Amino acid sequence: MTRPITAGLDGTEESIAALHWAAREAVRRGLPLRVVQVWHFQPYEAIDAADPDTQAGWVRDALDEAVRSVTARHPDLDVATDVVAGETVDTLLAAAAESEMLVLGSRGHGPVVGFLLGSVGQQVIAEATRPVVLVRAGDRPAAEAAGREVVVGQQGQPDDSADTLRFAFETAAARGATVRVVRAWTLPPVFAYSPGSMHLLDEAGGLEPFEAKALAAALRPWRERFPDVPVIEHLEIGSAGQVLLSVAGRAQLMVVGRRAHRTAVGARIGSVAHGVLHHADCPVAVVPHA
C-alpha cells in the first residue's frame, strides 16, 4: 500500500507553509498528498453563521483554495482532501498512522501554534506512530537549495537509531542532499572508572575513538544502502541538543528521534527533540523508534 504524505491544515500561515512543504516532498518521493482539516462547529449570534452546514462550507472553501495553490505549482500531483468533524488529536494521530509522514506548521522560536498549540501539539508529536515534520511559517523552497544538509542525530547502539537514519537517508536521496550525522558524547563520571581502566583508555587515545567506532558502525548499513548519498560524520563532545543546534544553520531539515513507548506519566517527546523543535529555524522531523 502506498502511504501518502499528509498535511494538517488549520488556516494559519504556518499550516499553509507546511502544506507547500508537504507537496514538494510528495513530488520528490513520487507519493500522493493528503490534506486534512479538522473542523469544530462554533456557534455565533448571527443566524446564518450558527448553521453547522454554513460553517462547514466555509472550511471546505478555505481548504479548496489552499489546495488550488498547490495544484497550480504541481499540476501532476495526486491530492486528496478531507474535512473531518472530530477531536483534533485523535484525527491527526489517525491520519499520521496511515501516512508516510504527517506535516504540520509551527512558529519560529518559542511555543508552537495552530495544531501545535499547547497540549494538542505535544500529544500529537509524542503519540504519533509515524514521523511528524514541523515547518516554520517563513520556510521557503530556497532553503532547500543545494549545499544545505539533512542533519540527523545518532545516539546509542546502531539499532537505536535505525529508524531515524533511514528517514534521513531516504530524505537526502530524494533531494540529492548530503547527510550530516551528529553523535554527541560526554565524559562519564570519573568515579565510574578504576585508575587501571582510565590508564587503558588513555593508551587507546581517550574515549573519542570509541565514540567514532560506534558512529561508523551505525552508519555502515546506510552507506551500503545509499551509496550515492554523501555523508559527513560529525562527532563532538557536548550535550546532544546543543551540538545539534550548533549545526542547525547548515540544515534544510533536521531529523531527531523519539522513543515510541509510554512511561508512567504517558508518552513523551524527549528533551533533545523538545529543544530542537523549539529552537531550530529549519523544518524538524521527529521520528519514533523502539
Name what the model sees in each region.
Residues 52-62, 200-211:
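A short acidic, glycine-rich active-site loop
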Residues 1-49, 148-202, 223-226, 230-231, ...:
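Small/aliphatic-rich secondary-structure junction motif
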Residues 34-36, 80-84, 133, 180-182, ...:
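General small-molecule cofactor/ligand-binding pocket signal
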Residues 121-141:
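Short, structured interface segments
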Residues 104-123, 145-147, 253-278:
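Glycine-rich, Arg-bearing micro-motifs that act as flexible, cationic patches
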Residues 1, 14, 53, 69-102, ...:
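Structural beta-alpha unit
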Residues 103-106, 132-137, 284-288:
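Short beta-strand elements of ligand-binding domains
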